[in-house]
């Protein structure tokens, strides 16, 4: 299985969600969209355990099945189509989440998240399993 992690689930993982850790260990590929990396690092800078959290992130990123996804021109096209789709439906989602959805669709991944607003993107494969 090929998955992408949303920020809330990466946070859960770093807070010791062993069920999620086990599930991710069974995945062939685990991707972090660049926006998730930025959001998680912003949280570190505002938190009281910055050093601990940065160590957790580094140890996660060196796993052979884990990678970072970067937007490309194709991602921008996916973003634009989704933006118009959601605007016409009157159901926008936050900008970073729109970028995340575009990357996940572009690479045909399953998004592991707790954010229900991703349901507004029906073509997006989602996994809402949570603690």
Locate predicted features.
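Short, well-structured N-terminal submotif of metal-dependent ribonuclease cores
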Residues: 1-36, 42-59
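Generic structural signal for small/hydrophobic residues in well-ordered secondary structure
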Residues: 6-7, 40, 79, 104
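Alpha-helix capping/helix-boundary segments
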Residues: 9-10, 75, 99-100, 117-118
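A general structural signal for well-ordered alpha-helical segments in protein cores
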Residues: 37, 53-57, 76-79, 97
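Short, hinge-like loop/turn segments at secondary-structure boundaries
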Residues: 47-51, 86-87, 128-131
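Active-site neighborhoods of divalent-metal-dependent phosphate/nucleic-acid chemistry enzymes
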Residues: 67-112
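Acidic, PIN/NYN-like endoribonuclease modules and their adjacent C-terminal/linker elements
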Residues: 101, 105-131
């Amino acid at each position: 299985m090929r998955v992408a992690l949303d920020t809330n689930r990466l946070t859960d993982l770093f807070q010791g969600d062993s069920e999620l850790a086990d599930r991710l260990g069974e995945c062939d590929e685990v991707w972090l969209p660049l926006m998730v990396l930025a959001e998680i690092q912003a949280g570190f800078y505002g938190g009281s355990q910055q050093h601990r959290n940065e160590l957790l992130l580094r140890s996660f990123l060196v796993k052979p099945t884990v990678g970072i996804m970067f937007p490309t021109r194709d991602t921008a096209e996916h973003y634009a189509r989704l933006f118009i789709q959601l605007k016409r439906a009157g159901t926008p989602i936050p900008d970073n989440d729109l970028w995340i959805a575009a990357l996940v669709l572009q690479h045909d991944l399953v998004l592991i998240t707790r954010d229900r607003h991703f349901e507004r993107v029906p073509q997006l494969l989602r996994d809402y399993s949570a603690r």
